[in-house]
């Protein structure tokens, strides 16, 4: 009787994927359209901007707070369930505060504090299920990107056919569905900590690898600031139509999905360090090419294909490295730091800095992004050595 040479353990693929799908579906519903809803209530651009800024502050604080709570709790998943239920219930307050600006802002931000702040903690649940098969992470995480894309498209269709007034009902429904998805998942017992990750006397803050990872991933997210904040405007100034702009964004999302799907193949053959270095240098090339090929749709399309590298590959490697570099007692804080400092702080700072350079020269803002990404690559190459990263720096034996 024949058996698989390397049978893969059973992983609750669809239950895990469902959480990522609905987390990103909530984002895909709120990010593009919540300002339109606020405008329909009669609020000014300044007021909607205030709400956006406060939500960004929330994404900087909430992950670390929840990381501390989860690391101290007996069950990480129970905290995730409770937090997501709280997010859904708090969001219901929005319906009572349409005409009360600050109460509305408080309800939206408090809800976001719960569900967005817990995203990093579910990464640990997923990685614990994967165990010795972290290469399978991408095929679970890709459903998050698919959820975001689906929500953006479907919500836009609903708003066009009916009214933006339906938006809070859609968000509330998605939040409750997200909570239900956490109920069908289960905790996975944590495996014994490898010798290479023994808890250090000084705790998480005395870990030099953690500090290096924070710097590298902060910089690469910082380099995305001009892209996330000004890419559409950049294309418009180059005379590219809105339809073509939408197509270019779609190419990037498609590349993101594809890269998540094929990451297991790469991770079977290359070390995380090698994947990271290649991704960082290609990210720098992407931003440099974007500035140099402004107005050339064919070249810009090819460059958008690199989004799978600059986002999907980088994110996958980051999640795994932040887990591997700390003791299990600090996993929640490590993932929270990545989410808050690198993603939240890096992108926010990148948008702000990119805006300042944009005022001088739009093209220069992308050259600046290229320099930042190249700097991240050089730091990773020089200081995140194979010996320092341990198993993550060596070729995978999967």
Feature locations, PLM:
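Helix-to-loop junctions at the C-terminal end of transmembrane segments
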Residues: 61-75, 159-160, 259-272, 358
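Conserved MFS/SLC helix-loop-helix module at the cytosolic interface between two early adjacent transmembrane helices
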Residues: 61-98
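Symmetry-related core transmembrane helices of the 12-TM Major Facilitator Superfamily/SLC fold
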Residues: 166-183, 365-383
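Juxtamembrane intracellular "pre-TM" segments in multi-pass secondary transporters
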Residues: 2-10, 185-217
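Hydrophobic core of transmembrane alpha-helices in multi-pass small-molecule transporters
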Residues: 21, 90, 101-119, 218, ...
